[in-house]
Amino acid sequence: SLKAAALGGESFFVNEFIAQEDGCTLGLTGNMLGDIEVIPVTDEFIVQSGAFVGSSGDLTLDTKWQGFTKGIFGSNLFMLKTVGTGDMFVNAWGGIIKKELQSGEKMILDNYQLVALSATADYRVTKHGSLKTTLFGGDALVIEIIGPGTVYLQTKNIMEFARALIPFLPQRR
């Protein structure tokens, strides 16, 4: 939708593919160097906007405001929310790990590691370290997720990948 495109970083065009006969295959690819995971959705799921590849079934895609802190210090200003029943396809940097959180169980991870989580889990961005680290280090905020819920995280970090490439880039003159 246009709303998802303007706010979620997705393409302004949503492609719809309809099989003309049984047994057809559709190939999907993401823009990140890593796995694509199929997540069965039966209610609501929250996904990083850059990780969303597509969906099937009766899923509705909408944007979900992350909040000021998450938008300023996080990797995306918006996350996407899927509502309904169907399969959601997500892409990640590296591999994708699925973690089931029990009620009250807590997981803390770097903002760049989150791919998706079920809406049954509570999440918030919290500061880790000093204010100086937060303002100048860029990696001082983490996501705290509290179960119950399902969390999908990626094994690689785009910011670490970008930092690793810097020594190989041509120098400005």
Predicted regions and their residues:
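Phosphate/adenylate-binding glycine loop and adjacent helical scaffold
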Residues: 1-173
